[in-house]
Swiss-Prot record:
It comes from the Bacteria. Residues 1-233 are annotated as: 2-C-methyl-D-erythritol 4-phosphate cytidylyltransferase. This is Bifunctional enzyme IspD/IspF. It comes from Wolbachia pipientis wMel. It catalyses: 2-C-methyl-D-erythritol 4-phosphate + CTP + H(+) = 4-CDP-2-C-methyl-D-erythritol + diphosphate; 4-CDP-2-C-methyl-D-erythritol 2-phosphate = 2-C-methyl-D-erythritol 2,4-cyclic diphosphate + CMP. PANTHER family: 2-C-METHYL-D-ERYTHRITOL 2,4-CYCLODIPHOSPHATE SYNTHASE, CHLOROPLASTIC (PTHR43181:SF1). GO terms for molecular function: 2-C-methyl-D-erythritol 2,4-cyclodiphosphate synthase activity; 2-C-methyl-D-erythritol 4-phosphate cytidylyltransferase activity; metal ion binding. The keyword Transcription does not apply. Residues 233-397 are annotated as: 2-C-methyl-D-erythritol 2,4-cyclodiphosphate synthase.
């Protein structure tokens, strides 16, 4: 098979107003990673080995949007646009008629709002069309959800999915055959159904789930998610607290990473003195550019007297979520002569990972001594270093 024996044009339909998307601008011009949906779609076809010409059917009122969308495209495969009509069928018809001078052997029809079409899918369509000499070939995916007939918000009956397929674009056809069919009717929402209506044989090949159409706001948000590169932020935190004698009648323990550890000394602090959580909170706030723990919970305020430090950790985690970030991983180094930390590491990891809503494998806790050097070496206190990596959240807004 040699596809280059054939002239192949792509007609991208971009004349719709996108009323279902509830957007202030037509959805084909919404930005994904700084470029319009239409730009991304055009680039897919410009890169394909079989496509010789590309024509875009646009809305007459969207000309300024279109010019901005293609301003960075210099490839001569992209022809001047044609104005579309009142509906999809009339836009396709006008687009086909504009290609008559070129007179391609085959035409590939594609929705502008399917920017995830792959090069492989375009290749498969063209090669199937040429190898098997079909009138048309379209991609289709199996219907996996239960299908029902509905009336007045109630299910009337359930439809068997066995023979059901969801038809996608791009769709490839014999150019003259498709043009003839369009010139004989007024309105069809899909080119393959138009051809079938005219008793033409249209074959299907396996489509791609990733080649979904951007129809609703939810689709747009999903597309933004897929196009957007994840963003990362790094933060470092440090805290140190002094050991003091246990007051008469008080429990003999300290708290580290939310875990009570028996010790013959107490920690001098305004809150509960969880030095590790304080370092973690500072690391998260630092990564977010939100100052430090003292700015949000000043030790001069009686409100935070003896406060459970888990409150501070919850605050930092919530602040990260508000800014669109989650903790990717956390590394903690506890420096003290006593108490021994190793017996409590598993419990500490569980506490911190639960508070941050991450798997405990992403929390690492190390402990070391100061080798009898300095104030920590003299067992006068405890210090903690914390490093955190944040990543952008992957969820639909």
């Amino acid at each position: 098979m040699c596809a280059k024996k054939y002239k192949i044009a792509a007609l991208i339909v971009a004349a719709g107003v996108g009323s279902r998307c509830n957007s202030t601008i037509p959805k084909q011009y919404i930005k994904l990673a700084g470029k319009s949906v239409l730009f991304h779609t055009i680039k897919r076809f410009l890169a394909n080995q079989y496509i010789d010409y590309i024509r875009i059917a646009i809305n007459r009122d969207h000309e300024s949007f279109y010019e901005k969308a293609i301003s960075l495209i210099t490839d001569t495969k992209l022809l001047s646009p044609v104005y579309g009509g009142e509906n999809r069928q009339s836009s396709v018809k006008l687009g086909l008629e504009s290609l008559q001078k070129i007179n391609p052997d085959f035409v590939v029809i594609h929705d502008a709002c399917r920017p995830f079409v792959s090069d492989v899918l375009i290749d498969n369509l063209v090669e199937s069309m040429i190898n098997d000499q079909y009138t048309g070939v379209v991609p289709a995916i199996e219907v996996e959800d239960t299908m029902s007939l509905v009336s007045n918000s109630f299910i009337e009956s359930t439809i068997s999915r066995g023979k059901l397929r969801a038809i996608q674009t791009p769709q490839i056809f014999n150019f003259k055959e498709l043009l003839s069919c369009h010139q004989s009717v007024k309105e069809f929402t899909d080119d393959s159904s138009l051809m079938v209506e005219h008793k033409k044989h249209v074959a299907i090949i396996k489509g791609e789930k990733s080649n979904f159409k951007l129809t609703t706001k939810e689709d747009i948000n999903m597309a933004k998610l897929l196009f957007e590169e994840p963003k990362f932020r790094v933060g470092a935190g440090y805290d140190i607290h002094k050991f003091i004698k246990v007051q008469n009648g008080a429990e003999s323990f300290i708290k580290i990473c939310g875990v009570k550890i028996e010790h013959n000394m107490a920690i001098e602090a305004h809150s509960d003195g969880d030095v590790a959580i304080h370092a973690i909170v500072d690391a998260i706030l630092g990564a977010l550019g939100c100052g430090d723990i003292g700015e949000h919970f000043p030790p001069s305020s009686s409100e935070w007297k003896d406060c459970n430090s888990s409150h501070f950790l919850d605050f930092a985690a919530k602040k990260a979520k508000e800014k669109g970030y989650s903790v990717s991983n956390l590394d903690i180094t506890i420096v003290c002569e006593e108490p021994k930390i190793s017996p409590y590491k598993v419990e500490m990891k569980k506490f911190i990972s639960k508070a941050l809503e991450i798997d405990d494998e992403f929390v690492n806790i190390k402990a070391t001594t100061a080798e009898k050097l300095g104030y920590i070496g003299r067992n006068e206190g405890i210090a903690v270093h914390a490093s955190v990596l944040l990543h952008t959240n992957f969820y639909w807004k």
